[in-house]
Amino acid sequence: MRQVARVIVFLTLSTLSLAKTTQPISMDSYEGQEVNITCSHNNIATNDYITWYQQFPSQGPRFIIQGYKTKVTNEVASLFIPADRKSSTLSLPRVSLSDTAVYYCLVGD
């Protein structure tokens, strides 16, 4: 039987800059699948970086990945940023139940 992992994403307003970020409220996935979470940030400044965090219940946010343009990959995730930088996509490969968390997209320098 395949387990369902729930990835919860909240709308956040970055305190690091004036760019407003918009994300989906929640999404479901089966274990072992790739999950892609898109964040819109239409009024991003030229020098702003895009940073993603993961937060588990009763814990503080944990840094996942940060990027400025194109594609960034680390051992946890990949971050895709198109040329216009008005959105970004966090890609989590092969999710499991332990990935159930709140994911935040923040924009700032």
UniProtKB/Swiss-Prot annotation:
* Native organism taxonomy: Eukaryota, Metazoa, Chordata, Craniata, Vertebrata
Q: Which organism is it from?
A: Homo sapiens
Q: What's this chain's function?
A: V region of the variable domain of T cell receptor (TR) alpha chain that participates in the antigen recognition. Alpha-beta T cell receptors are antigen specific receptors which are essential to the immune response and are present on the cell surface of T lymphocytes. Recognize peptide-major histocompatibility (MH) (pMH) complexes that are displayed by antigen presenting cells (APC), a prerequisite for efficient T cell adaptive immunity against pathogens.
Subunit structure comment from the entry? Alpha-beta TR is a heterodimer composed of an alpha and beta chain; disulfide-linked. The alpha-beta TR is associated with the transmembrane signaling CD3 coreceptor proteins to form the TR-CD3 (TcR or TCR). The assembly of alpha-beta TR heterodimers with CD3 occurs in the endoplasmic reticulum where a single alpha-beta TR heterodimer associates with one CD3D-CD3E heterodimer, one CD3G-CD3E heterodimer and one CD247 homodimer forming a stable octameric structure. CD3D-CD3E and CD3G-CD3E heterodimers preferentially associate with TR alpha and TR beta chains, respectively.
Q: Does the keyword Cell membrane apply?
A: yes
Question: Mind telling me which PANTHER family this protein's record contains?
Answer: T CELL RECEPTOR ALPHA VARIABLE 4, T-CELL RECEPTOR ALPHA CHAIN V REGION-RELATED
A Pfam family found in this protein is V-set
Assigned GO CC terms: T cell receptor complex
Signal peptide positions are 1-19
Per the record, the gene is TRAV4
Q: Where in the cell is it found?
A: Cell membrane
Tell me, which GO biological process terms does this entry list?
A: adaptive immune response; response to bacterium
Q: Which UniProt keywords apply?
A: Adaptive immunity, Cell membrane, Disulfide bond, Glycoprotein, Immunity, Immunoglobulin domain, Membrane, Receptor, Signal, T cell receptor
User: Which residues does the record list as glycosylated?
Assistant: 36
- Where does this chain mainly localize? membrane
Q: Does the keyword Cell membrane apply?
A: yes
Q: Where is the Ig-like domain?
A: 20-109
Q: Which SUPFAM superfamilies match?
A: Immunoglobulin
Among InterPro entries, the record links this protein to: Ig-like_dom (IPR007110), Ig-like_dom_sf (IPR036179), Ig-like_fold (IPR013783), Ig_V-set (IPR013106), TCR_complex_component (IPR052051)
Instruction: Spell out the disulfide connections.
Output: 39-105
- This chain's protein is named T cell receptor alpha variable 4
